[in-house]
Regions:
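Extracellular adhesion/carbohydrate-binding repeat motifs centered on closely spaced tryptophans
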Residues: 2-181
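General helical secondary-structure elements
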Residues: 1-2, 196
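Acidic, glycine-rich loop-and-strand cores that form catalytic or ligand-binding grooves
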Residues: 238
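Secondary-structure boundary elements
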Residues: 178-235
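Mid-length scaffold segments of soluble, non-membrane domains
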Residues: 242-243
Length: 243
């Protein structure tokens, strides 16, 4: 029983250490965005505001000058123009936050908790302001993983092949994925964003030691690959397990 409890704590500790850390960001209202009209107030040889497409690149000009490293809203859509003046696409890190833009450079707004596609990649939007999920997350009772640029894993494995992510981005629902989701749910329920990493680990340790887990159930086949993780899943689900 002690061996299984150690395994449960190790699994929860790994989940805590793997949790993405989101630094304190400026409020969405703090992002400098200038509302711009798509129509020049008066005819002019040089338009005051102009969105220009050259090949597959999109630029924004204000009084004839190319805008760089700025957010701009044009005809109701929000764009970010990078260091080269080109509107960014896909998942982009801006002020240490990953935002997602479509193939026309428009920010995915009002798409909170939805999966979207941009180019050949898919992303999960976690806020109404276009911020992407990073790392492991649960969506519609399925496990997903997003890389540091917010791109969902598709037809790829993680954790030495224990987790396989299908073409939809959802992990194959075997005991490995189910265990990962159960641990994430438990850790989320016993910790909070204000806790330090050591406080979270201590909370997990207390949960395993004092959480009311008992020895019981049929003997597992210890010669079968993955038996320990399968028993850990049963323990987390029912409170009983056989070490």
């Amino acid at each position: 029983m002690k061996t299984l409890k150690k395994l449960l704590f190790i699994i929860m500790a790994v989940a805590v250490l793997a949790m993405p850390v989101f630094g304190v960001q400026a409020a969405e209202s703090d992002i400098p965005v200038t509302e711009q009209s798509g129509v020049s107030p008066t005819p002019s040889p040089v338009p005051i505001r102009e969105l220009v497409t050259r090949g597959n690149k999109i630029y924004y000009y204000y009084k004839g000058k190319m805008v760089k490293n700025k957010w701009k809203r044009y005809n109701g859509y929000k764009y970010y123009f990078g260091a080269n003046g080109n509107a960014v696409r896909g998942g982009q890190r801006i002020n240490n936050v990953i935002y997602v833009f479509d193939e026309k450079g428009r920010l995915f707004e009002n798409k909170q908790n939805k999966i979207v596609k941009s180019g050949s990649n898919i992303y999960h939007i976690r806020t109404e302001h276009g911020r992407a999920s990073i790392g492991y997350f649960i969506y519609k009772n399925n496990l997903y993983y997003a890389d540091p640029k917010g791109r969902l894993y598709q037809k790829k494995s993680r954790q030495n092949g224990q987790l396989y992510f299908t073409n939809s981005g959802a992990a194959r629902k075997d005991y490995n994925a189910l265990l990962k989701m159960r641990v994430m749910q438990i850790v989320s329920s016993i910790t909070n964003s204000g806790m330090s990493q050591s406080q979270k680990l201590y909370a997990c340790w207390k949960y395993v030691v004092y959480g009311g887990f008992y020895y019981g159930g049929p003997d597992p086949n210890i010669y079968k690959s993955g038996w320990a993780r399968s028993e850990a899943l049963r323990m987390f689900r029912t409170g009983y397990g056989n070490c």
